[in-house]
Each structure stands twice: as C-alpha cells, then as structure tokens.
Amino acid sequence: MNTEVQLPTVPAFMEPLLPQGAGDFTWGIKASFRTYFERLPDHAYDLSGGAEGTESGGFRFPGRGAPTRDENGLWVIPFSGRLVLTAHFGALSVLIADPEVLVSPQGGVSLSAIVDEVEGRAARMVIADLAFEGTGGERLSPEANFSASLARDGQYLFMGNYYAGDPLDPAIIKSQPFPQE
C-alpha cells in the first residue's frame, strides 16, 4: 500500500511567490472606464492602505504575505490596499479593496476583491477572470503577466455598463525581490 502523500502541483508562475510572497499586484481596471471617469468634473480617486497609482494610470496593491490554500483547495495570493472611485455626486462609486488572486488546482485564475455591491455593504466577490500570459521582469524580481476579462459577478461593479467576458486591462503579479547572492 502506497502511503506517500501527493502534494498538489503549483502552477509555474506561483513558484517564485511561495517562499516570500507576492511583492505587488498591478492592474489598470479598464482604460476606457478610466478615460470616461476622468472626464467627469467631480471624479475622485481615493487610495489608502498601501494602494497607489502608477505612471501608466493603473493601480498597485502591495502583497500581504505568502500564498495560502483555502478550504476549497484554491491558492490565495493576498494583497492589501483600498481604491475608491467616486463621481456624479456620489451616484458613481466603485470600491476595490484587499484584492486576492485565486488559483484553482486545475490552473484557473481569478481576481476577487472587497466591493460595495451587496445590499450596500462591503462584500468579497470575484470581479475578473485572469489568463496567464507569461513571465517577465528581472531575474531577481520576476513577474507573472495575465490578460483579464470581466467575471460574471464583476459586471455588477460597473452597474451593468460592461458585461461578463468583456476584456479588461492586463494584470501583473510581481514577486518579492530575491536576495542577491
């Protein structure tokens, strides 16, 4: 009888993240949405908890620890920070906080975040489906690059203006820098 425990395989893009955790998650949401939003006279970005804007117009969320497994067997890559977009005198309000990249044992990848869409209370939901596109970055600080599309639940985040499957901006997970030898 074989009593050897089979450990679940880890997608290749996660290997650099396991020892020390993700460095940060960068995502622009959707460029056309940002263009529309920034034309509104009362638009405001409120970034806190470590979230920051990037030179390209996207947003960076810092890592908050090494990936873990949840009760369903998903790898959870956690990030921190809060982004709130408001305009139209408060009628437009989008919250994206403490994003998590979820990786299934079969390799499916999605993005969840705390949003303000369930009966006016913050709740976590999957907002984007991610597809691994390859690696980049520097040798001591590799990156995993993803294309993104709007998830079924994510369409509610944008008040029905975009639909499940619509393309979103690409996403990048950057690992913590490896120590120099």
PLM feature spans:
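N-terminal acidic, proline/glycine-rich, low-complexity intrinsically disordered segments
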Residues: M1-L7
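Extracytosolic secretory-pathway proteins
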Residues: P8-S56, R60, L102-E181
